[in-house]
Amino acid sequence: MVWSPVLLGIVVLSVFSGPSRADRAMPKLADWKLCADEECSHPISMAVALQDYVAPDCRFLTIYRGQVVYVFSKLKGRGRLFWGGSVQGGYYGDLAARLGYFPSSIVREDLTLKPGKIDMKTDQWDFYCQ
């Protein structure tokens, strides 16, 4: 098959046209968050899910009752009902953990690992979907 320059150009542009529809900034849930460190990389606490929660979009985590959740941030202001964290991806830990938000009301904090004392401004990457 012979590729014409126009057809080849269309294929190249469609492949390298930028982020896909799944890669996008989503609306911010809050302007501020509480973290344990300045990178928000250390978990504040460990919590246990009291009920199932199905993520409404890619910013959120789907969590099942009984799962251990690592809390990395607590949103402030208008988003104060949501915390940021991760759960292990598979039953035996064979899948990578994913970060996302969930309602604070569905978990019970069982262990404080490092108190959340640092107020951080959120940015677009805090609510970016991939």
From Swiss-Prot:
GO CC aspect terms: extracellular region
Residue span(s) of domain SH3: 42-112
Pfam families: SH3_2
GO molecular function: growth factor activity
GO terms for biological process, alphabetical: cell-matrix adhesion; extracellular matrix organization
Family annotation (PROSITE patterns): SH3 (PS50002)
Record's protein name: Melanoma-derived growth regulatory protein
Biological source species: Mus musculus
